[in-house]
Amino acid sequence: MLRVVAKAQYPAAVRCFSTSHAAFAKVSFESSEDFLKKIGRDTVKLAEKFETWDELKNSTSSDLKEKGIEARDRRYIMTQLYRYKNGEKIREIPRGKKTWGGERKRNLVQALFKAGQN
């Protein structure tokens, strides 16, 4: 025998799509130079490529590429802008340091190191 179970009396979930702009962090920056100083990694040297803070804040990765900014710096700036737009604390994230010659060379470097100890 099959039993029919009544459907729930609750309406389907309602999805709200926001059309407002992203809520930026409470920290505000006067110029692009201030932001680039805050994020560190010597990105302040790129401040001359941006006339205003709004130009940097609303930039896309392709905009930064057109300005001649290298991929590593572009990726770092875009990550920090993403954090800023999501209200996260802005701080310098130091570059990682390779151990044992990096992932690809690790086995070779460790083998040479161990061979040199004997």
From Swiss-Prot:
Asked whether the UniProt record includes Ribonucleoprotein among its keywords, one would answer yes
Which Cys-Cys disulfides exist here? none
In terms of Pfam families, this protein maps to: SAM_Ribosomal_mS41 (PF09597)
Primary residence? mitochondrion
Signal peptide start and end residues = none
Which branch of life, at top level? Eukaryota
Q: Where is the transit peptide?
A: 1-24
List where in the cell it is found: Mitochondrion
| InterPro entries reported in the protein's UniProt record | Ribosomal_mS41, SAM_Ribosomal_mS41
This protein's GO CC annotations: mitochondrion; ribonucleoprotein complex; ribosome
Which keywords, in A-to-Z order, does the entry hold?
Mitochondrion, Ribonucleoprotein, Ribosomal protein, Transit peptide
Fetch the SMART domains from UniProt.
IGR
Family per record = Belongs to the mitochondrion-specific ribosomal protein mS41 family.
Its function, per the record, reads: Involved in telomere length regulation.
PANTHER family named among the record's database cross-references = PROTEIN FYV4, MITOCHONDRIAL, SMALL RIBOSOMAL SUBUNIT PROTEIN MS41
> What is the name of this protein?
Small ribosomal subunit protein mS41
Q: Which organism is it from?
A: Yarrowia lipolytica (strain CLIB 122 / E 150)
